[in-house]
Regions:
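Acidic (Asp/Glu)-rich catalytic clusters
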Residues: 100-108, 126-139, 164-174, 195-203, ...
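Catalytic beta/alpha-barrel core
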Residues: 114-122, 145-147, 167-168, 175-189, ...
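Conserved N-terminal beta1-alpha1 strand-loop-helix module at the mouth
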Residues: 53-130
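C-terminal alpha-helical cap/extension of soluble enzyme domains
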Residues: 54-79, 275-338
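N-terminal mitochondrial targeting presequence
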Residues: 1-56
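Active-site-adjacent beta->alpha loops and helix N-cap segments on the catalytic face
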Residues: 95, 121-134, 153-164, 182-208, ...
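Active-site mouth loops of central-metabolism enzymes
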Residues: 80-98, 116-121, 143-162, 185, ...
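Structural preference for beta-strand elements that scaffold enzyme active sites
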Residues: 80-84, 112-114, 139-143, 176-179, ...
Length: 338
């Protein structure tokens, strides 16, 4: 088995040596060392210190706020359920001042920040580090997008070397999570697992992104996606189980395209099948539209893990809290946790 994420988070500091690292599975082949010291940082939140010092939101302040109003209290960070990851720079520019406004007002409700695709490579280093440091100060982990697809497909004859350099630079910048997407690539399952293990060995957390729609994750038109067709959902489920059970991956992302995005009818059967086979805390669903995350909360409750655009965080937080919603969820989202 691969080195579990939990052991990486609690194992202190360790040096990765040349060749097979201790505990690596037989899938791994000896490769040059990534000169990196592994620091402990949980996937569920980048820093817990900020969470305890953050002022109470008014909804949870019984003495001086609106705590008398019925609501669903949010679990404290770091969370493994009810996790919300938000999209950072992509559709809009986001710098430190913009992100500071988002996190100073809504940071309680944000667990992760994701840079879509390779958007982070378009920054100069100082403002990028400022964004990452700011997220960590608010107890928010930072994830790359699926840019490793570009690294794999454009690295010439030294793919392993390019991947190691990519991981080392992401680590040095302060990233916590590396998304492993293959929406545009045909990659053998064992190779995908090797990538996850390589990420773990670099002291980072792998977040495989899986979906039934080939060509998803970019700006491909709905008509083009439909002409490509979709994969059998069992392929996604089997791969997700291998990541979680065999490679120790803490959480996989389920791509929305082909399921709730760019489809004539939502494939809710795929979602139900995934959650029959995997625990809720090991899965995060992309919810590209408010009607989509409204459905997820209605069907699976407040504990479902969701990825949304940063512009939607207030709406999603209100829905999780049960203080507003659409006609089918308003006043209906509740919990029982005595």
């Amino acid at each position: 088995m691969a080195i579990p994420l939990r052991s990486l988070a609690t194992g202190g500091f360790r040096r990765i040596c040349t060749g097979k690292p201790p505990g690596a599975s037989r899938l791994l082949k000896p490769a040059p060392c990534i000169a990196n010291t592994i620091s402990s940082r949980p996937f569920a939140a980048a820093a817990t210190r900020a969470s305890s010092s953050q002022p109470k939101i008014l909804l949870e302040d019984r003495d001086n706020g609106f705590g008398f109003v019925r609501h669903n209290p949010a679990p404290p960070k770091p969370r493994t359920r009810s996790v919300t990851e938000i999209r950072g720079p992509y559709y809009t520019v986001m710098g430190p001042r913009y992100l500071s406004d988002v996190l100073e007002t809504m940071g309680t409700h944000v667990d992760g920040l994701k840079f879509a695709g390779g958007s982070f490579s378009l920054f100069s280093e100082r403002p990028l580090r400022d964004i990452i440091d700011l997220a960590h100060a608010h107890g928010v982990y930072v994830s790359t997008g699926g840019w490793i697809e570009h690294v794999l497909s454009s690295s010439g004859g030294d793919i392993a070397g390019a991947v190691d350099k990519y991981l080392a630079k992401c680590k040095s910048l302060g990233f916590d999570v590396i998304e492993l997407s293959t929406g545009f690539l045909s990659l053998p399952p064992d190779d995908w697992l090797r990538l996850a293990e390589r990420v773990q060995n670099a002291g980072l957390k792998p977040k495989p992104e899986l979906g039934i729609q080939f060509g998803a994750g970019g700006d491909t038109s709905a008509a083009e996606l439909q002409s490509i067709g979709t994969s059998d959902p069992s392929k996604v489920i089997n791969m997700a189980k291998r990541f979680v059970k065999d490679a120790g991956v803490e959480r996989v992302m389920i791509e929305s395209e082909g399921i709730t995005e760019n489809v004539q009818a939502w494939r809710t059967d795929v979602i139900q099948s995934i959650l029959r086979e995997l625990p809720l805390e090991n899965v995060m669903f992309e919810a590209a539209d408010p009607s989509v995350f409204n459905w997820y909360i209605r069907e699976f409750g407040v504990d479902v893990n969701l990825f949304v655009d940063h512009s939607q965080i207030v709406q999603l937080a209100g829905l999780r809290a049960g203080i507003w919603g659409k006609s089918d969820t308003f006043g209906k989202i509740t919990t029982y946790r005595p």
